[in-house]
């Protein structure tokens, strides 16, 4: 017998039967990196970025955990002196062609008395979302970006390595 009173014989072979089950079990995972360079967005409507990945759920009851990390630089500028300005970059997640989440924004602001200057904010924006797509067909998730310039002008730049991870979990 491989199992004694209190010891497990580690040199023996064991066979386990049955399936691992239960909510939260990871069924599959997709991961993608994107090297972004010189991507500049000045549109006040959402524009698709290159950050995308897709997954085909194995059951309609599955949950998809989406995690994304995006390098964002928001620049606000004013071409005439003596003005305050402010710009904000917005990042949204789309499932296929439908906006799914829009809860992340970063802003740059400043004040100048010179002929041209700018204020900015930069960093990595990181999020996790839990989705219930209720399908066994392929589902594509994509990051969209837009600018809102409340005063002056501005732009959102994506520069650096972005990533997106999709994890199907049993519900």
Region spans (language model):
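Terminal beta-strand-rich extracellular "head" domains
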Residues: 32-45, 56-138, 142-171
């Amino acid at each position: 017998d491989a199992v004694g009173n209190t010891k497990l014989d580690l040199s023996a072979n064991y066979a386990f039967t049955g399936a691992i089950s239960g909510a939260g079990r990871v069924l599959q995972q997709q991961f993608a990196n994107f090297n972004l360079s010189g991507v500049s967005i000045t549109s006040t409507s959402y524009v698709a970025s290159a950050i995308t990945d897709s997954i085909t759920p194995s059951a309609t009851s599955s949950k998809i955990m989406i995690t994304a990390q995006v390098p964002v630089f928001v620049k606000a500028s004013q071409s005439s002196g003596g003005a305050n300005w402010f710009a904000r970059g917005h990042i949204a997640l789309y499932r296929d062609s439908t906006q799914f989440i829009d809860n992340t924004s970063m802003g740059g602001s400043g004040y100048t008395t010179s002929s041209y200057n700018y204020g900015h904010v930069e960093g990595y924006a990181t999020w996790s979302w839990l989705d219930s797509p209720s399908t066994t067909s392929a589902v594509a998730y994509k990051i969209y970006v837009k600018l809102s310039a409340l005063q002056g002008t501005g732009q959102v730049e994506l520069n650096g390595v972005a990533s997106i991870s999709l994890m199907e979990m049993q519900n």
